[in-house]
């Protein structure tokens, strides 16, 4: 039997970066298009609000019911006051999954051309919440520049019974974020890496 989920016992890469570099400044939903103007979402995913929590973007996908979601994306974008060490990102990419007692955890570095100066990771695992089983993916993108940096966290959670039905839409969400980030970096005037 697994222990009850305790949100206070779960930490994230963002918390680790804040402890190492300094307080992060969350980018509000209204400013997301300024940072990632090409970011879109699959048509059936709807924007939602979260009571008591601040997120840059929350998308929900319902297939069979209006009473619960079958897919969820939480996207957070933060300004970072300093340089984030690569090892910190790589060592903590799966932290939220480990702290949540997920199973079948996998974590890897994503390849990004060196000219972008992006540290990118993907971690996935299976979470059990009561009688519900969900597959979770976490993508992290850290951009270091001389003027500070940015952290993008993308969490996608899909009900295990809907994995095959939503697979292409999940791929669209992750690929669109990746491409939008690189396009935004390409457009930035005289970007200098730290």
Show which residues each predicted segment covers.
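N-terminal targeting sequences that direct proteins away from the cytosol to non-cytosolic compartments
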Residues: 1-70, 81, 127-135, 143-194
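Extracellular-facing segments of soluble proteins and assemblies that are Gly/Ser/Thr-biased and enriched
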Residues: 66-108
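Signature of long, low-cysteine stretches enriched in small and polar/charged residues
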Residues: 91-144, 183-187, 191-194
């Amino acid at each position: 039997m697994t222990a009850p989920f305790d949100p206070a016992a779960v930490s994230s890469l963002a918390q680790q970066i804040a402890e190492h570099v300094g307080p992060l400044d969350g980018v509000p939903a209204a400013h997301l298009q300024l940072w990632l103007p090409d970011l879109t979402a699959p048509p059936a995913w709807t924007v939602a609000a979260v009571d008591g929590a601040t997120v840059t973007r929350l998308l929900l996908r319902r297939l069979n019911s209006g009473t619960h979601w079958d897919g969820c994306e939480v996207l957070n974008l933060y300004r970072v006051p300093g340089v984030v060490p690569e090892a910190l990102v790589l060592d903590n990419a799966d932290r939220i999954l480990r702290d949540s007692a997920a199973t079948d955890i996998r974590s890897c570095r994503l390849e990004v051309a060196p000219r972008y100066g992006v540290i990118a990771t993907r971690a996935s695992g299976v979470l059990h919440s009561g009688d519900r089983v969900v597959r979770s993916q976490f993508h992290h993108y850290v951009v270091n520049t001389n003027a500070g940096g940015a952290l993008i966290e993308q969490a996608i959670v899909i009900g295990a019974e809907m994995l095959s039905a939503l697979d292409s839409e999940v791929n669209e969400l992750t690929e669109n974020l990746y491409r939008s980030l690189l396009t935004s970096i390409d457009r930035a005037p005289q970007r200098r890496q730290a």
